[in-house]
Amino acid sequence: MREFTIHKNDADQRLDRFLLKAVPLLPASLAQKYIRLKRIKVNGARAERDYRLREGDRLQLYLNDEFFEAPSEENVYLTIANPKLHILYEDENILLLDKPAGLVVHADEGEKVNTLVNHLLAYLYQKREWKPREENAFTPALCNRIDRNTGGIVIAAKNAEALRVLNEKIREHELSKFYLCICLGRPEPPKGRIECFLRKDSKTNTVRVYHHPVPDGRSAVTLYETLETRDRLSLVEVELLTGRTHQIRASFADMGHPLLGDGKYGVGSVNRRYGEAQQALYSYRLRFDFPTDAGILNYLRGREFIADEVPFRRKYFG
């Protein structure tokens, strides 16, 4: 028998959803069966699968040991002795991290250890702000993600309530995200709005731009303003009103101004001439608008954060 004590970050979850996180090797169908058979109890008594857990509840799980074997990559953050994070801002609820271009956000086939999320977990674990043995189901998480070869601001939630609020606010478009990019040529008009539809091509890992609705296409809206043009390159500020995969890269390529260094949508000969192997794109400014109640994060309303430095801006525009 294993027993869990519900702490603040685990509270207010349905019992069945908590089990999916706390015991990931236990299939959902089997969890429901064991709840019915009273092999899973709350405070020593039978509970329904939709029971809302409360802080201080004690769960008794009469399950075989194999369901509690840790996944092989679960504790990989422990191998990071010196976590490397560029922290723009930190408080008791969130961190704003300035991710360098080239660092992957989450593990993929090419990288399992050196990821932004693993450095985050190692940092909080070593500060003793995150204690996995006490949390049961909650793990600090990143709230937005950007491509490996794109740098910029990534939001991290330290606790479950902050994660819930941020996910809701991102979904409701109550945060404003601004990017800097360098594109080829000068966009005309120099300031404008791009509305299109993007459809993913899983075979090529790219998206295709359409100017009319298409099956599986998702609407994309982008605002841009050209800040400076020099040597047939333009520095452009972009605001995303939607957050689609490769939205900026594909939209600018479609209007004839691909990003410098972009290996998927750009011009190879130009990239080689400038010696750029990563797209000149950086998530450099973030504003917490929060026009509606943000609960424990209300103190962030109206606050704006800007990355300390955008490497390609200094290189090409001084």
Model feature map: region roles:
Residues N43, H106-A107, A157, Y210, ...:
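Thr-Gly-centered strand-to-loop micro-motif
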Residues L95, V236-E239:
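Short, well-ordered beta-strand segments enriched in hydrophobic/aromatic residues
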Residues M1-K33, P83-L85, V214-V221, T226, ...:
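Pseudouridine synthases involved in rRNA/tRNA modification
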Residues D91, T150, R230, L240-R244:
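Short loop/turn positions at the edges of beta-strands in beta-sheet-rich folds
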Residues M1-S202, I306, P311-F317:
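RNA pseudouridine synthases
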Residues E48-R52, E237, Q278:
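Short, surface-exposed secondary-structure edge patches
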Residues N43-E48, R232-L235, R272-R273:
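Short alpha-helix capping/helix-loop boundary micro-motifs
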